[in-house]
Amino acid sequence: MGHCYSRNISTVDDDDEIPSATAQLPHRSHQNHHQTSSSSSIPQSPATSEVNPYNISPFQSPLPAGVAPSPARTPGRKFKWPFPPPSPAKPIMAALRRRRGTAPHPRDGPIPEDSEAGGSGGGIGERLDKNFGFAKNFEGKYELGREVGRGHFGHTCWAKAKKGKIKGQTVAVKIISKSKMTSALSIEDVRREVKLLKALSGHSHMVKFYDVFEDSDNVFVVMELCEGGELLDSILARGGRYPEAEAKRILVQILSATAFFHLQGVVHRDLKPENFLFTSKNEDAVLKVIDFGLSDYARFDQRLNDVVGSAYYVAPEVLHRSYSTEADIWSIGVISYILLCGSRPFYGRTESAIFRCVLRANPNFDDLPWPSISPIAKDFVKRLLNKDHRKRMTAAQALAHPWLRDENPGLLLDFSIYKLVKSYIRASPFRRAALKSLSKAIPEEELVFLKAQFMLLEPEDGGLHLHNFTTALTRYATDAMIESRLPDILNMMQPLAHKKLDFEEFCAASVSVYQLEALEEWEQIATVAFEHFESEGSRAISVQELAEEMSLGPNAYPLLKDWIRSLDGKLNFLGYAKFLHGVTVRSSSSRPMR
Ligand SMILES: Nc1ncnc2c1ncn2[C@@H]1O[C@H](COP(=O)(O)OP(=O)(O)OP(=O)(O)O)[C@@H](O)[C@H]1O
Ligand SMILES: [Ca+2]
Ligand SMILES: [Ca+2]
Ligand SMILES: [Ca+2]
Ligand SMILES: [Ca+2]
């Protein structure tokens, strides 16, 4: 009971509610907001455009504890408050049913990329060019029928193709009104939504894109008609609880779409049961993801900062305004939780209460029906709902999790491997030695995933060269990947041109310390790793050198002293663990993680 009334929450004062009238501040934020505000006490790493992962903790918000961010947005984007207040019922069933019955928008309102409401983000009086360059003859090609769905930004109708390749076929047409495009940014959003639908259309769990048109009043997006309705309706129809086998079948489809668009460098930002549709009413209907209206490109070396999404599904780091693809994984964690137990993991009477809950409360895994749900399923959900985005599984990893592994339609390349390998090959020899020792202690389960990724990269003579990484990425590239500039990472992997990674070293390179640390066996793993390090990787290191290794300044020296053994000048166990973790002075001394 009381899913969100955890101990954490009850310590929060009630006066930090987000005032619902802080709407539409003209406040400007910029891409680096989070970094700049948290960098004051943390020395920055040498001038690279990369985000230093060690400097970013989801717990280092520039905001006071419990306070959700101000509505500062990407330039010109307004934050619309309040969105429909959540109903006080806890089980998703009742809450959703009520909302559907009453509100004109039957669903959880998204935290919108605002497109309605007066004013223009590009400056008052500016004339907006609402010409998209799309074809104009929609009416000549399609016959419009009844409405099949409605959202905040448009409505979707049934239609029939009158001519062309799909003549006679029924389709869905999302009609987006130009009158709602009141800023250059909202026009850009529609342009991007169409571009993404088109680029990602090939995947079996993406809705198929056919065509796009416009006239003076509307944009018409023609796509595959999904006649089975929304996943939300199906959740409501069966009382909100799925047997594990069925939950798995749904999640595998959600994750395989997500792994695909994440590999393209696209973050959806609005994953929720309303945005998944079944192709038919049949038992074996395929699930498709729709609505890329809030989606964006996620460059590998940048973090997004606009607070968008739907309150119940929004990840903590989104509220802290520094996030990337992991935010979608959190939303899938929320969906998983709902599928399995029928309740929301994070709940509150008001939007700010929901946000506090998301930031601080631990979801309830103790009350009914959780005792009857398998421990492995619970483990799965927990590894998606980790508040630290670095400790969360990726979509590709989630597909390889033992709970889902058997259902698996085939593993997908995980871009996070590229990021980790890139860091590894650019790291100091000392750090690489530390990681090599760690790789010898990786649990069997995690090795299964790494082996699969190794094979997907198609090693030659038992090892991976730079061109294997290039070829693999190219194989899966769509226009979206080009736009998100993920392949740029290959330039930073140049040191690999003269090297070959065998499986052992690949493991050292692509193991995520953060994820291992989230495991119950971490202590044990670190102990074994340290033994290896002692016998083959360690050497004496000075405090200064260690500080440099960790991109820390002289103010860290006193702390680092405790990590080095006076006996032989080598790292002690604590030092080794901290070094692996890459902890910042701030989070080690005053803000313990978790
Ligand atoms: N291809 C489709 N086939 C059948 N129904 C669809 C299709 N696309 C959309 N719909 C229906 O129309 C609804 C609204 O579509 P969509 O989510 O794309 O619009 P939106 O205005 O962006 O919504 P939101 O308010 O969630 O942002 C969907 O929830 C769904 O019920
Ligand atoms: Ca909707
Ligand atoms: Ca939608
Ligand atoms: Ca949308
Ligand atoms: Ca953006």
Curated annotation (Swiss-Prot):
Record localization: Membrane
Binding site for Ca(2+) 3: 538, 545
Domain Protein kinase: from-to ranges: 142-404
Regulation: Activated by calcium and calmodulin. Autophosphorylation may play an important role in the regulation of the kinase activity.
InterPro entries: CDPK_Ser/Thr_kinases, EF-hand-dom_pair, Kinase-like_dom_sf, Prot_kinase_dom, Protein_kinase_ATP_BS, Ser/Thr_kinase_AS
Calmodulin binding (CaMBD), as annotated region: 427-447
Binding locations of ATP: 148-156, 174
Phosphoserine PTM sites in chain numbering: 310, 352
Catalytic reactions on record: L-seryl-[protein] + ATP = O-phospho-L-seryl-[protein] + ADP + H(+); L-threonyl-[protein] + ATP = O-phospho-L-threonyl-[protein] + ADP + H(+)
Parts forming coiled coils: none
Post-translational modification: Autophosphorylated.
Positions of Ca(2+) 1 binding: 461
EC number of this enzyme: 2.7.11.1
Gene Ontology molecular-function annotations: ATP binding; metal ion binding; protein serine kinase activity; protein serine/threonine kinase activity
SMART domains registered for this protein in UniProt: S_TKc (SM00220)
Domain EF-hand: 445-480, 481-516, 517-556, 557-586
Active site per UniProt: 270
Annotated region (Disordered), positions in chain: 1-126
Assembly behavior: Binds calmodulin (CaM) in a calcium-dependent manner.
PANTHER family: SERINE/THREONINE-PROTEIN KINASE (PTHR24349)
Family indicated by similarity: Belongs to the protein kinase superfamily. Ser/Thr protein kinase family. CDPK subfamily.
Domain notes: There are 3 contiguous domains conserved in the CDPK subfamily: a kinase domain, an autoinhibitory (junction) domain and a calmodulin-like domain. The autoinhibitory domain (408-438) inactivates kinase activity under calcium-free conditions.
Entry protein name: CDPK-related kinase 6
Provenance organism: Arabidopsis thaliana
Lineage, opening ranks: Eukaryota, Viridiplantae, Streptophyta, Embryophyta, Tracheophyta
